Regions:
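Asp-based, Mg2+/Mn2+-dependent phosphohydrolase catalytic module
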Residues: 1-26, 39, 120, 124-263
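N-terminal helical cap/lid subdomain that shapes the substrate entry/recognition surface
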Residues: 4-125, 142
Length: 263
């Protein structure tokens, strides 16, 4: 642990010397960027099926089967109606069982959340550099606050933009513009970090923000990668190194790998 902290301190000092004066803030997506939200959703789905299966030995216990209901787009990604549809289509619905499944869903999502390695330390180092940190998420304010509180990061961010605040979801530019307006910053003064090329990288880049693609959290890779982001993060800790390269005249972006290389 001491060795890791010493390495982080060394990186921070190097970044402090090279950080571009124009970079003033880092705007983070939340789910699958700070923590693996899909993993806890699947755990919650598994526990729901386990509960329902106690009275039906023939029920398939594949959590992906229930998870697919959340992906349909019929309701929101966290809407209980997805659980209700699943239960009704399998003739498992009762009001009592439904309430219990919703409680299981909320409980398991939160209690199993774990930050990706290095998130807490990296955020602390970014703040030491004087960078302002904010969240831009498609979750609503209630769920965003609950998750950030659970992992102990609620106070790490100066501002949070949620779907119920803007009335839209990414890739609508309103999320990014709302954050910039709240922070009083220009697009070129901010960096966006997110796991979705379509919803985070592409719209942010079109607005003129710098972009860092959190590939480690992208559970639905897309072919839409060409020129859609400035740098690829294979781990969250890679962010410190990228910020350190932004001011270097000897570093350029590899158009194929989107990683920084010396010419």
């Amino acid at each position: 642990m001491n060795q890791i902290r010493e390495t982080m301190e060394s990186v921070r000092k190097n970044v402090q010397q090279n950080r571009p004066k124009t970079l003033k803030a880092v705007l983070f997506d939340m789910d699958n960027t700070l923590f693996d939200f899909v993993a806890v959703k699947l755990i919650a789905c598994r526990e729901i099926l386990s509960y329902l299966g106690e009275g039906d030995k023939n029920l398939k216990k594949d959590p992906a089967e229930l998870f697919r209901y959340f992906l349909r787009g019929t309701y929101g990604f966290e809407d209980y109606e997805n659980i209700k549809d699943y239960m009704q289509e399998r003739k498992l619905f009762t009001a009592q069982a439904y309430r219990q499944c919703c409680e299981i869903y909320d409980r398991e999502k939160l209690q199993n959340l774990e930050l990706y390695p290095g998130v807490r330390d990296t955020l602390e180092e970014l703040k030491k550099l004087g960078l302002r940190l904010a969240i831009i998420t498609d979750a609503d304010r209630y769920h965003a606050h609950a998750r950030l509180t659970r992992v102990g990061l609620l106070d790490s961010f100066e501002f949070l933009v949620s779907a119920d605040m803007t009335g839209t979801k990414k890739p609508d530019p309103a999320h990014f513009l709302f954050a910039l307006d709240a922070l009083g910053l220009k697009p070129e003064e901010s960096l966006v970090v997110g796991d979705s090329i379509k919803r985070d990288m592409a719209p942010a880049r079109r607005l003129g923000l710098k972009t860092a693609y959190a590939s480690y959290g992208d559970w639905r890779p897309t072919e839409e990668t060409e020129q859609c982001f400035d740098f690829q993060l294979n781990t969250f800790q890679d962010l410190m190194g990228y910020i350190g390269t932004l001011n270097s005249p000897h570093v350029q972006t590899d158009p194929q790998n989107k990683n920084q290389i010396d010419p």
